[in-house]
């Protein structure tokens, strides 16, 4: 039985990683220091490098000595891309720039017992592909045509040297300086082919060679790279740079389908090109269509008329530049017209619009805010209450009233603010006998006799109001602090919601001592005419969050987010609205915090003070 054949080696192997700082001695007695790797190719790795004793960075390509692509490129550089050859060509053509790199050094070195090939060329700023991706996949047409002009000059040099590039694309085009497209450089000669022995005889083994979406129809058929093929590839690239895509982009994984799509596209020219470049000018479409036309009419082995092509591209650049100059002028004119028009500032205040008749040419509208109303003095409260009444909101923008009407308004608003918050207290069953509750027709006042000596003069305490009597305020706060906290855990506590008496008809009670005793014996049913007593189980959030006369609950006022949604608040000017919301929410947050954090007190002290 014959021995099994060893598995075939891969066509191209990736080079081993060379450490940074490794020194390579060239045959020219120069030493180069390997820098960081910044890219990889089908043949190997690409590093930065410097010459020992110098700081200028260069590019070093490294691959195993058994690989072929870098060898092909080294041969091309040694034949036609030496620095002295390029300088001689520039003098002959009387040009100052040509978009081709030159060879600095090349050779072999051994790294970890592996023989490697290297080549050093100049380093450039960035690639056109990186710029295109940064711009969202496209390039400005003027920039694209400028790059195309540089590439045509580079291809002319290669074609005169009997070489076809065969792999023109944005990834193989570098910019010497960032943002400067007039000095674009064509690199990567791994697929470059010498055309002296070209014969129009397709070979299926060579079919679809190159970058599938850009490669020429000659390469799809299996022919060697040709001069006309380079122009066809450049035309495909211009389509890609203008639109960011190609009609056969989705078919890239199937080279045969891409080839069929390209044949149909070329057969339908120039209509198919116009469908792709809908947003471009006729000069641009005509230029690219002519590139396809010249490519198709040139024989496989013939050289392309570069002079005609460069003139087409130059004319298209000039027309694109002239079109680009007209557009900013038009935009500048429109901007000046917009500047002349006066745009009114956003405001919630009523605006008086006055039209100027002096200037007949420019119909400008002058917007003047109405005279600001005289600000009202703040009430005795620290925070400003926010009411939902539309009348209160409109008062800020109306003309100031007379002195007497303002005084009446202030007193009315002060009364409304006093009765704004309906308070909730909780009275334990054990202390009901010590309290005396009297009800009035419109509201209710809680009267608590302090002792037998003071029965001749009883006081009416309005719970939850800002009273001038310090003792009544103190008692109300103590009752609230103690029994509000205890109501959370003890079922014996009964919450009592007491509606506030109207300021118009306040009632006072002056009971005798005997009537006070009788009131102690009153049952909860007699008292319940104006006071609703509920057990802890029956307490609902609606009762705990009793709404005020303005229709806004204390919980809403304590929350800036909820307070901002109140319809009346939106009528305030923006700066004033934020200040009111901040002050109001801070006030009610402080009130809620004081109810929860203040210490408790003894029942006996409370009853004695009452």
Curated annotation (Swiss-Prot):
Return the Polar residues bias intervals.
465-474, 550-559, 594-610
Ranges annotated as biased composition (Acidic residues) = 388-397
**What gene codes for this chain?**
vrk-1
Q: Where does ATP bind?
A: 38-46, 61
Modified how: Autophosphorylates in vitro.
Where expressed (tissues)?
Present in germ cells at all stages of progression from the mitotic zone to mature oocytes, but not in maturing spermatids (at the protein level). Expressed in the ventral nerve cord and vulva cells.
User: Known SUPFAM superfamilies for this protein?
Assistant: Protein kinase-like (PK-like)
Q: What is its EC number?
A: 2.7.11.1
Q: Where in the cell is it found?
A: Nucleus; Cytoplasm; Nucleus, Cajal body
* InterPro entries xref list: CK1_Ser-Thr_kinase, Kinase-like_dom_sf, Prot_kinase_dom, Ser/Thr_kinase_AS
Query: Which portions of the chain have biased composition (kind: Basic and acidic residues)?
Result: 352-373
Comp. bias (Low complexity): 447-458, 502-517
Catalytic residues (positions) = 167
Q: What cellular component terms from Gene Ontology apply here?
A: Cajal body; chromatin; cytoplasm; nuclear envelope; nucleus
Reactions performed catalytically = L-seryl-[protein] + ATP = O-phospho-L-seryl-[protein] + ADP + H(+); L-threonyl-[protein] + ATP = O-phospho-L-threonyl-[protein] + ADP + H(+)
The name on file for this protein is Serine/threonine-protein kinase VRK1
């Amino acid at each position: 039985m014959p021995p099994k054949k060893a598995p075939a080696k891969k066509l191209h192997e990736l080079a081993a990683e060379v450490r940074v700082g490794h020194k390579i001695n060239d045959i020219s007695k120069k030493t180069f220091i390997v820098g960081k790797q910044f890219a990889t190719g089908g043949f190997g790795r690409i590093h930065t490098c410097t010459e020992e004793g110098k700081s200028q960075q260069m590019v070093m390509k490294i691959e195993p000595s058994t690989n072929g692509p870098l060898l092909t490129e080294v041969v091309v550089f040694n034949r036609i891309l030496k620095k002295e050859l390029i300088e001689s060509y520039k003098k002959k053509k009387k040009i100052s720039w040509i978009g081709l790199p030159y060879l600095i050094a090349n050779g072999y070195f051994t790294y970890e017992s592996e023989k490697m090939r290297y080549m050093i060329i100049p380093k450039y700023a960035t690639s056109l592909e990186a710029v295109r991706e940064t711009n969202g996949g496209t390039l400005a047409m003027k920039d694209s045509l400028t790059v195309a002009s540089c590439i045509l000059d580079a291809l002319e040099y290669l074609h005169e040297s009997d070489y076809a590039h065969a792999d023109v694309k944005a990834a193989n085009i570098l910019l010497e300086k960032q943002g400067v497209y007039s000095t674009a450089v064509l690199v990567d000669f791994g697929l470059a082919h010498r055309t002296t022995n070209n014969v129009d005889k397709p070979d299926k083994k060579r079919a679809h060679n190159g970058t599938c979406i850009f490669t020429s129809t000659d390469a799809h058929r299996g022919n060697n790279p040709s001069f006309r093929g380079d122009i066809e590839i450049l035309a495909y690239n211009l389509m890609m740079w203008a639109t960011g895509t190609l009609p056969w982009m989705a078919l890239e994984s199937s080279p045969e389908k891409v080839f069929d799509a390209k044949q149909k596209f070329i057969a339908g020219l120039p209509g198919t090109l116009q469908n792709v470049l809908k947003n471009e000018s006729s000069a641009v479409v005509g230029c690219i269509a002519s590139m396809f036309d010249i490519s198709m009419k040139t024989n496989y082995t013939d050289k392309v008329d570069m002079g005609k092509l460069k003139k087409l591209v130059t004319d298209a650049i000039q027309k694109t530049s002239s079109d680009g100059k007209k557009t900013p002028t038009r935009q500048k004119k429109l901007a000046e017209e917009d500047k002349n028009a006066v745009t009114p500032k956003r405001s919630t205040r009523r605006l008086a619009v006055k039209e100027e008749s002096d200037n007949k040419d420019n119909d400008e509208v002058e917007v003047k805010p109405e005279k600001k109303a005289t600000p009202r003095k703040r009430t005795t409260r620290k925070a400003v209450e926010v009411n939902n009444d539309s009348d209160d909101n409109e008062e800020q923008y109306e003309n100031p009233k007379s002195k007497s009407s303002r005084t009446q308004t202030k007193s009315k608003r002060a009364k409304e603010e006093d009765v704004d918050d309906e308070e909730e207290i909780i009275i334990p069953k054990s202390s009901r006998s010590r309290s005396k509750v009297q009800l009035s027709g419109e509201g209710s006042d809680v009267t608590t006799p302090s002792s037998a000596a003071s029965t001749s003069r009883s006081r009416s305490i309005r719970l939850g109001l800002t009273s001038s009597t310090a003792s009544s305020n103190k008692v109300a706060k103590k009752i609230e602090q103690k029994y509000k906290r205890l109501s959370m855990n003890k079922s014996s506590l009964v919450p009592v919601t007491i509606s506030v008496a109207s300021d118009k008809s306040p009632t006072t009670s002056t009971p005798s001592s005997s009537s006070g005793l009788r009131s102690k014996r009153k049952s909860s049913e007699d008292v319940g005419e104006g006071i609703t007593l509920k057990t802890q189980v029956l307490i609902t959030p609606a009762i705990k969050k009793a709404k005020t006369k303005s229709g806004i609950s204390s919980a809403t006022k304590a929350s800036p987010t909820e307070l901002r949604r109140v319809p009346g608040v939106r009528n305030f000017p923006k700066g004033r609205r934020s200040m009111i919301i901040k002050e109001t929410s801070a006030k009610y947050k402080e009130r809620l915090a004081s109810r929860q954090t203040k210490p408790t007190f003894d029942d006996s002290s409370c009853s004695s003070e009452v």
